[in-house]
Amino acid sequence: MDKKMFCFQCEQTVGCTGCTGNAGVCGKKADTSKLQDELTGALIGLARAIDGTAAISKETAQVIIEGLFTTVTNVSFDDAAIKTMIQKVRAEKERLVPDCSKCQSPCGRTDEYDMQQLWNADEDIRSLKSLILFGIRGMAAYAYHANVLNYEDAEVNQFFCEALFKIGYEESVETLLPTVLKVGEINLKCMALLDKANTETYGTPEPTTVTLTVEKGPFIVVTGHDLKDLQLLLEQTEGKGINIYTHGEMLPAHAYPLLKKFSHLKGNFGTAWQNQQKEFDHLPAPILYTTNCLMPPKSSYADRVFTTEVVAFPGAVHIDEKKDFTPVIEKALELGGYKEDQIFSGINGGTKVTTGFGHAAILSHANTVVDAVKSGAIRHFFLVAGCDGAKPGRNYYTEFVKQTPSDSISLTLACGKFRFNDLDLGEIGGLPRLMDMGQCNDAYGAIQVAVALADAFGCSVNELPLSFVLSWYEQKAVCILLTLLHLGIKNIRLGPSLPAFLSPNILNFLVENYGIAPVTTPEEDIKALMSHNK
């Protein structure tokens, strides 16, 4: 594959075939893409050195998880940071198998993997290995966040190694398919782990109304997904006259009791990640990126971008593991914020949003929900969830939610919700018709609700009046999709376009066995989805 780069892991990849020029659509340069491939190859070499199926230490697992997370879309644009990560992986391999580097007759069994072998492979093999790779990249983000809170799972850790080992060897479609579904199985465990970590650390999320108004005076915007970073920043800014506003996937933080107690956690600024270059333009406040999604900043706010953990951008101030946020705090005081309160609105004009309808909150009303379904007051549930993005066509999700019948409830999670989360759809029997369940990893909660409802009605999840309408952009959406497939969930609508890494044969397999279909129009899809449960 004689191209400057090759990457097709995100939904916006050029022509739905792959980014191959001087830079990707996400903004990463060709050299950065090549370094990400080198890092992935080094990770596969590390997995080979461990022999794939062997148990691994916590230290080795953390290196693998950090390395995989670094390659997720919109995480790191910093070549130096990626090179440092590559050396970290190689050092861990040297620690585990020091004799390999000194061997006079190398066997090749622990060599690093050349990713060109994958990109140039038979299209079905490439498709399945890509599903595995992108799935574990997404899962690594969840494992990383759990690890930050000192939660880990030995089975999850070991599977990263097993999956990388599989990618590095010749396999058949028949032997790869079970591993693809196993990514979904292990990701379910990983999301459960993160759910436990978040709720045991910060409390069970509670339905919470969040203002979109930014008060006058100094403030800091926190984006990404990492609740621990937000907690530490709240602690360090307490009493300093600085307000904190969430952005994007940090919105659900407002629902956690331990975080809600901070009076200077005021509200949410902006919408989803792809609007940041417009929303942050000349922003009189610093922005702290705790995870993806980072876009190359415009010059009008580049001096107020701060990164931490695996997020990195050349020239941006990086807050290291000591977590001293003094530079961010000083920048907030220097910029001063707005002179007067600023009333902002969501995409549809709403000035407040509600979050915190996690699985515990919804299931606390389980009897009400069951009775409403039996009486006919609730006729259908829609899970309209997933990533947002810049590609045209994503207004489909806004229109879909607007057009859902008045006797239906829409559940949502992840940043795709910003297309419609400021809408007021009213209530059914005291329950909001639109409920935000949280971040993308809170897909675990949606699954728990679905399973509980199926148990209550004595049926399978596929027999429930429940439909999945998903939007995707990056690799966390891939691992969630694989979890749904592992659970046997059928008739999922996926958009706005299908993944470029799905070959025609693999796509056909998913269509025939799981009923996956691309989104069409809101009207047609609502009609078709509701007909499944007649």
Language model: regions and residue ranges:
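Anaerobic metallocofactor- and corrinoid-dependent redox/one-carbon enzyme cores
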Residues: 2-37, 41-45, 55, 178, ...
